[in-house]
Amino acid sequence: MYGRTLAGLRTDSSLESNVIPMRAIQVLIILICFLCNMLDGMDVLIISYTAPAIAKAWSISPANLGIVFSSGLVGMTVGAIFLAPLADRFGRKPLMILAALIMGTCIYLTSYATDVNILMIYRFISGLGIGTMMASTAAITAEYAPASTRDFWVSTVVAGYPVGAVLTGISSAKIIAENGWEHLFELAGLATFLVIPILFFFLKESDEFKAKAKPEDAKISALFTPEFKWSTWQLWSALFLSFTTLYFLMNWIPKLASNAGLSMELAIYSGTIFNLGAIVGIPVQGYFSTRFGLKKSIGILLLITAVLLGIFGQFSGSNLILVVLFFLGFGVQGSFVGLYAVAARMYPTAIRSTGIGWAIGMGRLGGILGPILGGVLVGLGLGMAESFLFFALPSLIAGIITLKISSQTIS
């Protein structure tokens, strides 16, 4: 049954929204998905920006802080694997509304957390919504975007993630200094609630989804048919390793910078510069992907990232550190977002959210590991240079694996 469905998905172009020029509805959907990913970036990175203040207020050890970081990532993993695939059956729209409701509620309630255990619970539950949202936005963007520029638009939509992170970083230093870290969570929760009516009134399922969705076998076994099996393993491995490095950097840069002697405000801005690099790197990667191919552009970016991580220590004590952080954000986030585009291109409509959700979920396992390893390294007394050198290896391996992904499955 699935083989016949897959054949139809590959050959039927009459329902593809991407065979005609961009229409107003396509632009609207892309903007909505970009906004949702901005909120994702805000909700994920807010714990990183508030970590120095929370750690100081509660006297949290580096190891426990790493567990707090990872609790949200565990939730994102569970959401991506078990909730996001439901969008292939019930639709992208209801899942995105549910995700926004979960995120907004738990982010707001985090402002009332009084100890580490409660903080971990709220981070886990909010992570369920974040993991669901990211997979759904990538899937619906792939269905609406024109075929010739699909990779660019998927990458651009996911670029909302670092945009939200940067805006949060820019505002958080002042908000925390004047009103405390709790107020930042309150504002983030309210901002997330505001997107719910936008999703309800303006988000539309694609014609492609409505015609081909709700198959009986939109399940994980569909990702391991002979056509997809090897490429699925390669994609999962590349995402796992990329997320390991990415989430170490996103969560620990402000704290490591603070440990290195920077003021709390400058430490927060160092994380902002990292995410600013992503804002530039993601659309540039999308452009290069349309020109030179997904595999080549992503793989090379990952290899460059590994080199930058390896030589970071050469810039210690120099103002060039901020420049290197910018290009690290450019490379690691540009490449990992490109892997979302690979997943969106690799799997057909009937299993697209399932494929993207599981790929993100496997990546999130690396995202869980990265901050925990960071906590161990910091607890051992390692500084930024030594920690960055350690994480050069997963970026190197991820780059090599990406270059080996079968071109046939993403053509």
Regions found by a protein language model. Give the residues of each.
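Extracytoplasmic
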Residues: L28-P62, L249-P254, G370
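Cytoplasmic helix-loop-helix junction between adjacent transmembrane helices
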Residues: Y122-A159
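Helix-loop-helix hairpin linking two adjacent transmembrane segments in secondary transporters
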Residues: V157-F201
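C-terminal transmembrane helical hairpin of 12-TM major facilitator-type secondary transporters
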Residues: S289-L339
